[in-house]
């Protein structure tokens, strides 16, 4: 379970900065130090933390706070999703956003920020069913 929790923590950080950096073309420092963007980063991280519960992984609000503060301390770097976008490579939207959205839906929890990032990056609305976006083991 500790490994699963660490994987979820990594996804929380990735979901917080990767998609928004691709939408805004901003590096991590800008995302976490501009209030409106920082609020979206933090909100996406909270949504991802809630999604972890579907897999039986408990992420506390204090842990999300710690991860957000860690990201704020990063040097200004381009995220992997921004680099992929700039190089014309396919973005890992299903793995990063789709899995969070699907789990939040199954739990009846909101994922508005994550859903809006999906829509912005795909230029299409979310399907009614997200079956197949993740496999539960």
Regions from the language model: what does each represent?
Residues 4-32, 36-49, 76:
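Active-site-proximal catalytic alpha-helix in oxidoreductases
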Residues 1:
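Conserved anion/nucleotide-ligand pocket segment
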Residues 39-137:
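NAD(P)-dependent Rossmann-like dehydrogenase/reductase catalytic/cofactor-binding core
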């Amino acid at each position: 379970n500790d490994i699963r929790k660490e994987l979820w923590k990594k996804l929380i950080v990735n979901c917080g900065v990767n998609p928004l950096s691709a939408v805004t073309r901003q590096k991590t420092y800008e995302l976490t130090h501009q209030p409106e963007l920082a609020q979206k980063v933090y909100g996406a991280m909270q949504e991802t933390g809630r999604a972890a519960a579907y897999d039986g992984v408990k992420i506390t609000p204090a842990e999300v706070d710690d991860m957000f503060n860690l990201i704020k301390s990063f040097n200004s770097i381009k995220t992997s999703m921004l680099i992929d976008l700039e190089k014309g490579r396919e973005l890992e939207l299903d793995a990063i956003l789709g899995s969070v959205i699907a789990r939040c839906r199954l739990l009846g929890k909101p994922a508005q920020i994550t859903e809006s990032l999906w829509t912005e990056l795909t230029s299409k609305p979310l399907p009614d069913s997200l079956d197949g976006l993740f496999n539960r083991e």
